Amino acid sequence: MQPRQPGDEAKQLAELEVVRQMMTPTREVLLELHESFLKELQRGLEMHKRHGITWVPEECSMKMLDSCVSNLPTGAEVGEAYAIDFGGSTCRAVRCSLLGKGKMEIIQDKICLRSAEHRCAKGFMDKKAGGKELFDQFAMCIRGLMDRSGDLKKAEETNTPVPVGFTFSFPCAQAALNSSFLIEWTKGFETGRENPDRVEGKDVAVLLADALQRHNVPAVCKAIVNDTVGTLVSCAYQRVPGTPECRVGLIIGTGFNACYVEPEASNYGYTGTVVNMEAGNFHKDLPRNEIDVEVDEKTHNRGKQQFEKLVSGYYIGEIVRVAAVRVFGARAPEKASVRHSIHGETASTIRDDHSQDKAASIQAIKECWGVTMDLDDIKCIWEICRLVFDRSAAFAATLAVALCYRTGRLDTGSTVGIDGALYVKNQWYREAVEYYTKLVAGDAAKNIHYCIADDGSGKGAALIADVN
């Protein structure tokens, strides 16, 4: 970095104060967000009543999808259930031993779908790969796990197929609990696009059932599950005795989403009671600032996922970078002008550095931007990270409070299940969520309990298959 000139320190502190004002929402701002979100939620329910599974973005920014899940576990269930967790280049087969009293044991097997041994460059993700090839991997993975656990022989001898939940984290139109049509691939998947054996437009439950039959796997797909819904269900089973029932689920990680139990679901045309909101796309009356606008304008999906861009780990690093360039002005490192040159994980490392010398933070910035900052400058970066993460926690907490209110449980008590690395891995983030919950909810905050649903997607899918 360029050495300080006379007056630079005062300018830097003044700009930092501007960023602090931008990134510190007042209680009044959060209450306005709370009301705006509830109004948009209501518009979404009315949209679903009119149009069913068809999303009409002009009527609601959130999709408000029917999960088709009605039955939630109590924690007393016992037995074995399986899940296939598929949402990226790695697929997992998961076996849950439900022990009752909210306890469970997990074993799992993983496969990499970007296989170097596959004939196509991107493995089973490649556009020239066929759908049967991909779904055969799922069937073989779960068969191997069933064999290893002894369940395969038992199911064959008793002619009793095991229930399987299928976490399929791609855009789908859910027609029933065990019927979901892939709208389009995301996350780099193109399977079947240049192969007669396509996947897009097909019912993934049928594709899985066919693969299980081809490989003689005594299993039946009971449910297609979104990872956010799985989080709610997982915490419904594992919540601490004496705490309220889980009625809200959040993902706060690379992305953001929310689901909740809608008390009037049937009145709005839902077959289940759990609504998958796709809340990352919420954008009505958001308290955005000029830094947020700059970040959004340079994304590939400008104008979309606006709430997610304020909260999720994927965008936090970019918000920190843009804020830092503003604060340091002409002294900003050259590499700081490169988009995504600091990631959310790096910003988290800096925020987590409570040492006096900030050695970990200095090293993190050196790796990102190729400069060694002095202590004053690195403390400035640390403060920017704190502000951005705290605002994320404030907005996430506000939505959690709003959803507890919508479920009708704010006064009597509700548990909020949360998964996602940003929340699960960082105690300081969880503490910030608690702080802002109290700020928004006031005395009612004592009725809101947060539950970590580590691996909610796998556990939740297995539980849904077991109880629905």
Curated annotation (Swiss-Prot):
ATP binds at residues 85-90. Keywords: ATP-binding, Glycolysis, Kinase, Nucleotide-binding, Transferase. One of its GO terms (molecular function) is glucokinase activity. GO terms for biological process: glucose metabolic process; glycolytic process; intracellular glucose homeostasis. It catalyses: a D-hexose + ATP = a D-hexose 6-phosphate + ADP + H(+); D-mannose + ATP = D-mannose 6-phosphate + ADP + H(+); D-fructose + ATP = D-fructose 6-phosphate + ADP + H(+); D-glucose + ATP = D-glucose 6-phosphate + ADP + H(+). Pathway: Carbohydrate metabolism; hexose metabolism; Carbohydrate degradation; glycolysis; D-glyceraldehyde 3-phosphate and glycerone phosphate from D-glucose: step 1/4. Residues 163-189 are annotated as: Glucose-binding. CDD domains: ASKHA_NBD_HK. Its EC number is 2.7.1.1. Residues 226-455 are annotated as: Hexokinase large subdomain. Residues 10-466 form the Hexokinase domain. One of its GO terms (cellular component) is mitochondrion. Belongs to the hexokinase family. Catalyzes the phosphorylation of various hexoses to hexose 6-phosphate. This is Hexokinase. It comes from Toxoplasma gondii. The gene is HXK.
